[in-house]
Amino acid sequence: ERDEIMEFVKAFVIGGLICVVGQIFTNCYGAWGLEKQDAGTAASMTLVALSALLTGLSVYDDIAKHAGAGTLVPITGFANAIAAPAVEFKTEGFVLGVGAKMFTIAGPVIVYGLAASVVYGFIYWLYTIL
């Protein structure tokens, strides 16, 4: 049970550190003149790019071994889910390797996320006209 508690603590701390880094990027982009929403978008894009880079360098997996869900839940985990299969299957070529396998993990998330947004958008639209 003690190991399980430590896993929770490590996931919480590392996931929190990822969020702190994202907030630092947001603050920096804001200080450089971007509006709040644009700064948040730029910070998210930066985190995605950094996590894809760390995945390609095989560093992200080492972090994830210690952090567990702390690296999977933030947006960085989604970037890792797309980049990892792309790196793994690059030897099979760009079309049948990278292109075909890149969304094996993230594809269902995209499909169901899009479907849910359509349903919620329709419900919101109905709510606004009633």
Give the residues covered by each predicted segment:
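Juxtamembrane boundary at the C-terminal end of a transmembrane helix
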Residues: 120-130
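Residue-level signal for the membrane-embedded core of alpha-helical transmembrane segments
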Residues: 12, 16, 110-117
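Hydrophobic core segments of alpha-helical transmembrane domains in multi-pass membrane transport
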Residues: 16-24, 47-55, 117-121
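Loop-to-helix transition at the N-terminal end of transmembrane alpha-helices
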Residues: 33-52
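Short, Lys/Arg-enriched N-terminal segments with co-localized hydrophobic residues
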Residues: 1-5
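Mid-chain, well-packed structural core segment of small domains
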Residues: 60-95
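Residue-level signature of transmembrane alpha-helical entry/exit and packing/kink sites
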Residues: 7, 11, 43-44
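Individual transmembrane alpha-helices with interfacial aromatic-anchor signatures
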Residues: 99-115
